[in-house]
């Protein structure tokens, strides 16, 4: 009815993860018979009584990959905002997780609780990896270099024990940094930003945070009023708090900051911290801050709309065109440098005006310069050359180097001439794809009769390279059934029904499991080549067992 009679062409599903996947897929197919461009998206959270597919295959983030149904991505959200929506209260050391868990968008200046130990620094650098991955559509197969210098697929980057990258197409990535649940972006930042930081700097942090969504691949989701520095007076959950906390001042005269303490049932544990924060007069923006943020947002919208390169349709296009510089062990914290190629090596000419785009997101409180060897002919985007923000007008390019002021996102374009030019191709020279474990951080075991079918440490396979895992163990003469599996019998979990046997291997039978007959006791090496998990052109895993 809604699609046919009322011409509704987009549907958002609350707690979609509590629905069966097949119901959602079937519903989309039916609605697209009326309008083939209908959009489905929803909350693919995995929790509660249906968690881990306990009752059916859920419509959660991981399962919805490949369905063309979008899911909200908490990966970039948490990385930009800092911490998680569940932070609150005081920890065992008397510190506030809501305060010390700074994110990419608000960590320019350390606050009094900011942690500077190596684990905390690594955590912030890991956040930058999550931001990059989110801006690349959160693709499971996207190749990036992490903060340790390791080449990884998106699905092998960690997010609280789950794969950070999980989509198969960018449109499945609903990218956001604020919505009706939990604190607004302004209020969340107020928890993190150092005391005494000017309201103008706070407003710039808001714009920088929003730019990670507006310039990334996927579908941007913008919370009403984000461009107006909207506050709900630190209210975490405002669905039942009335207009006093939920109002949006569309005239830009005020942002509803500090109109009262939030409700005790949701935020009582944070009242002492909130009272300290609202006592800081710099935490309240003025009308000029609000107006500039609004204009910066409208400019980001114009920039996104100006080029198809910000709206790539397929994973293949993203992986051929989108690259990140300032990566690895020596990267500058707080700096994202993203290039999008439209040169001849990228394929079709998607942007007839430009051969390449470089977006520099500087969330630090200092001007940053970054050199990309081979970059030529870039100029600041004409929207920003005529910006309402005088600061971004100071961004420049010269001698292969992009320079961007503090707390600023600048977009540079390489204008196309009479025909498609060289552009700025993805740099694969420093990416070692042979070092990518097909199963990421998951430990693969040989589990079978030789170890009671348990995930025994001595039978944990080591990743070698190029998709190959190996383990050597002692076996007595006899017959053994076994599988290649993880500790939870999830992924991987297979025997020899659907694999190929490598040359030189002892013959392996199959009855669902692999069947090995050992004629002589001794040392045996088991290998698994799972390159098929990384290369769609390889159909099956290849396995072998050899006597040493």
Residue ranges and their predicted role:
Residues 154-358, 363-371:
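Loop/helix patches that line or flank the sugar-binding groove of alpha-linked glycan CAZymes
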Residues 433-479, 487-513:
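Aromatic-rich carbohydrate-binding modules that target alpha-glucans
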Residues 201-202, 300-308, 365-397, 406:
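C-terminal accessory region downstream of the catalytic core in glycan-modifying enzymes
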